[in-house]
Every structure is written in C-alpha cells, then in structure tokens.
Design a protein with these regions (language model features):
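Class I S-adenosyl-L-methionine
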Residues: 1-15, 20-123, 211-214, 221-222, ...
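Short gly/pro/ser/thr-enriched loop/turn and capping motifs at secondary-structure boundaries
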Residues: 39-41, 132-135, 201-203
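Short, surface-exposed amphipathic charged segments that create phosphate/polyanion-binding patches used
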Residues: 75-83, 140-143, 165-169, 207-212
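A short, acidic, amphipathic alpha-helical segment used as a generic capping/interface helix at domain edges
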Residues: 86-88, 156-164, 177-181
C-alpha cells in the first residue's frame, strides 16, 4: 500500500501560528522533507519553525530537498525530478511524508511543481493550510489588508509595475534586489507603505513608512502600500 505525502504550511515564522492540524500530522509522519537552498545545509527556516512546535521532529527521518533559488527552467526541472524520485521511493515503502513549506502551501510555493510530478506518477498530495506572511504582517502592523468591498492584488515583486495602478489594496512580496525600484514606483503613484521583514522570526523588523524601508531589505519582506 502506498504511503501518503502531505504539504504542510508552517506559517511565516512564529511557531505559535502553526495550526493544530499541522502539528498533529507532523507528529504522525515517518519522514520530514523540507527545501534547502544550499546542498550542504541540513536544516531550513521551515524546519526550524516546525521544530519549535514539535521538538521531537529531529528524531524522525529527515529528507532535505535541494531547491536552488534560480530561474533557469532546466535546473528547476532537474531538481524537482530528483526530489520526486526520492519522495516516490518513500511512498512506495508505505511511509507517511511531510513536506514543510513557509506560509501557506497554495501561495508561491515551490512544492507546486513537485506535486505535479508526483501526481503524474499516481501520488496525490494532501495540503495543510498555514498562515500567510502577508496576513501575519498586517496583524503585526495592526492594519487590515482589505476592507468592505475593496479588491486585493498580490504582487511577487514588481514584475508588472502597472498592476500597482489597479484600484484597491496591494500586497508586494519577494522584492529583494528590487526594493529601490519598488519604492520609486510607489512614490511615483503618491503612495506611502509599511513593511515587515522576517515576520514572526527572531530578526523581525517593522517599517512604518516607505522612507524607513532599506533598499537591502531581505527576501522575506512584505510591503503593504497605503491608499486605494
């Protein structure tokens, strides 16, 4: 009998934001998989968050999955195919595998492509929702993301700056390396912005105006522009 693969959102950084279901399933799983950026690494941000909520996780069988932060499609495909083979072999043994991911698994999650490969080979994924970084950031700032009949647009960096002109509220994610451009575009539109870097983590930083946001703000920075 085939095992089961779960993709579990561990939230943005604060282990207390992990859901009861996430904690339960992690405890029940035989193998804990998680993405790493460096092939030499043996842990990750997602794993360290989960370990705070489930200390015994380190005693389980661990499977670091190399997931380089690159845009080359061939490299990405090769790493996903290798990971799919590793996970498939475990599922064929009847094991339960938990794949940990930051935030929620249905928002900009690298596992999506891996899940497709597994599905093509007859392995279906069960997803466990987690708190998104932008919801957690809004809570830390004490401001609603959207209210009443406002629309909400989520942008990965500023790949299409014209989207900032759309009516309603906006959330800007993954802007590392483009922060100066993002701020210039917001200023050109007459918008101020708040932001949270590394929300819920030990090195969390809160910026309450666009002038406070540094150009070198990290990858895990969520920007919430003001105005409509």
């Amino acid at each position: 009998m085939k095992g089961r693969i779960y993709c579990i959102g561990v939230g943005p950084g604060d282990a207390e934001l992990m859901t009861l279901k996430a904690v339960r399933i992690i405890k029940e799983c035989d193998v804990i998989a998680y993405p790493i950026k460096d092939e030499q690494a043996d842990t990750s941000v997602a794993f360290n968050i989960a370990r705070q909520a489930v200390p015994d996780i380190a005693a389980k069988d661990l499977l670091p999955i190399f997931s380089p932060m690159v845009r080359d499609r061939n490299t990405i495909q090769e790493t996903h195919e290798r990971a799919a083979k590793q996970i498939s072999s475990l599922l064929d043994e009847g094991l339960k595998v938990a794949y940990l991911t930051l935030g929620d698994p249905m928002i900009y999650c690298t596992y999506t492509s891996l899940a497709k490969l597994l599905s093509e080979n007859g392995y279906e994924t069960e997803y466990v929702s987690g708190v998104t970084s932008f919801c957690a950031a809004a809570a830390r700032l004490g401001i609603p993301i959207a209210d009443r009949d406002e629309t909400l647009t989520i942008l990965p960096g500023v790949y299409d700056v014209s989207a900032l002109k759309h009516p309603g509220r906006h959330v800007i994610m993954k802007s590392a390396g483009k922060m100066h451009q993002v701020k210039d575009e917001l200023r050109a539109l007459g918008k101020d912005a708040m932001a949270v870097e590394n929300c819920g983590m030990q090195d969390e930083k809160i910026y309450r105006s666009i002038s406070e946001i540094p150009d070198d703000a990290g990858y895990f920075t969520v920007i919430l522009p003001s105005g409509k």
